[in-house]
Amino acid sequence: MSGQPKRLMVMAGGTGGHVFPGLAVAHHLMAQGWQVRWLGTADRMEADLVPKHGIDIDFIRISGLRGKGVKALLAAPLRIFNAWRQARAIMKRFKPDVVLGMGGYVSGPGGLAAWSLGIPVVLHEQNGIAGLTNQWLAKIATTVMQAFPGAFPNAEVVGNPVRTDVLALPLPQERLAGRDGPIRVLVVGGSQGARVLNQTMPQVAARLGDTVTIWHQSGKGAQHTVEQAYAGVGQPQHKVTEFIDDMAAAYAWADVVVCRSGALTVSEIAAAGLPAIFVPFQHKDRQQYWNALPLENAGAAKIFEQPQFTVEAVADTLAGWSREALLTMAERARAVSIPDATERVASEVSRVART
């Protein structure tokens, strides 16, 4: 039996912030001979994405409870029980040596199922504030890791696993030294875009004129509107795209990024070594604010809460950053990144599987 490959079940779903770090760890362990399966839900992004990476996926039926009506909350215990039972049956068949919870609703019943079967549970919290599921699962987990300090008081800070093409970018001092001309501003609202960025940045461009050149990811369905907004203020030269398929190339092009501060975005920007203006999504947990704070504290970024993200404030900030200042900020961003996060998470999974 000792010669058989170890088996891992990754539990992650819902958003790229959960799924992509899970894929990074899965590929790292598969390269070492591990067998990996995935636990997810059939109606979220993991259903299409994970099989494209050559990983088999099993589905359970579960969704979030926040913001649901009374009827849904009353039905929640039965739904969670059924999801737990489904996850338990899947794990009995696959017999994983360890399960890795990377977040999303699927981790709750999945983690409980593993624990009830005596399978070690390893958790990774991507955000600066722990989600409800991970807060609860941490009580039964064998190991808890966190990307940013503060989500859990005693958990090891290991960073977020980041795509290898971002990690492979030249260091800031190689990439940015010697650049001249307009400051290159990359505007990224995520795959869904961000209305506040789409509305504000064309006006910022009008104020800054030919001192900046902008590459603006508008999100689905917004490209024409944003192009019209730039043209309407006499700035039609800036590039607007719905999506950016090659984010590593976009980071390599940029001098500074203006974006939301989802956990994976913040970690990628740090790994790339880029200054940033972060506009946290407004949420009662202020999760994105806490994600961005370590980079602001390091002198690598500026946070604008959404009400403070005005044309004047952003234009003044960008105008006040010289190329020398941007290079210093880029080096600070890179210095606080944890480029071996994938290896750290994979190493802990391996350690737990051996014990």
UniProtKB/Swiss-Prot annotation:
Coiled-coil positions: none
Cited HAMAP family: MurG
Function per UniProt: Cell wall formation. Catalyzes the transfer of a GlcNAc subunit on undecaprenyl-pyrophosphoryl-MurNAc-pentapeptide (lipid intermediate I) to form undecaprenyl-pyrophosphoryl-MurNAc-(pentapeptide)GlcNAc (lipid intermediate II).
Pfam families: Glyco_tran_28_C, Glyco_transf_28
Binding site for UDP-N-acetyl-alpha-D-glucosamine: T15, G16, G17, N127, R163, S191, I244, A263, L264, T265, V266, S267, E268, Q288
Alphabetic keyword roster: Cell cycle, Cell division, Cell inner membrane, Cell membrane, Cell shape, Cell wall biogenesis/degradation, Glycosyltransferase, Membrane, Peptidoglycan synthesis, Transferase
Gene Ontology terms, MF aspect: UDP-N-acetyl-D-glucosamine:N-acetylmuramoyl-L-alanyl-D-glutamyl-meso-2,6-diaminopimelyl-D-alanyl-D-alanine-diphosphoundecaprenol 4-beta-N-acetylglucosaminlytransferase activity; undecaprenyldiphospho-muramoylpentapeptide beta-N-acetylglucosaminyltransferase activity
Pathway(s) this gene product operates in, as recorded in its UniProt entry: Cell wall biogenesis; peptidoglycan biosynthesis
Record protein name field: UDP-N-acetylglucosamine--N-acetylmuramyl-(pentapeptide) pyrophosphoryl-undecaprenol N-acetylglucosamine transferase
Swiss-Prot/TrEMBL catalytic activity: di-trans,octa-cis-undecaprenyl diphospho-N-acetyl-alpha-D-muramoyl-L-alanyl-D-glutamyl-meso-2,6-diaminopimeloyl-D-alanyl-D-alanine + UDP-N-acetyl-alpha-D-glucosamine = di-trans,octa-cis-undecaprenyl diphospho-[N-acetyl-alpha-D-glucosaminyl-(1->4)]-N-acetyl-alpha-D-muramoyl-L-alanyl-D-glutamyl-meso-2,6-diaminopimeloyl-D-alanyl-D-alanine + UDP + H(+)
Domain of life from the UniProt record: Bacteria
Localization (cell): Cell inner membrane
Family stated for the protein in its record: Belongs to the glycosyltransferase 28 family. MurG subfamily.
Gene Ontology cellular component list: plasma membrane
E.C. code: 2.4.1.227
Alphabetical GO biological process terms: carbohydrate metabolic process; cell division; cell wall organization; lipid glycosylation; peptidoglycan biosynthetic process; regulation of cell shape
Topology within the bilayer: Peripheral membrane protein
InterPro entries referenced in this protein's UniProt entry, alphabetically: GlcNAc_MurG, Glyco_trans_28_C, GlycoTrans_28_N
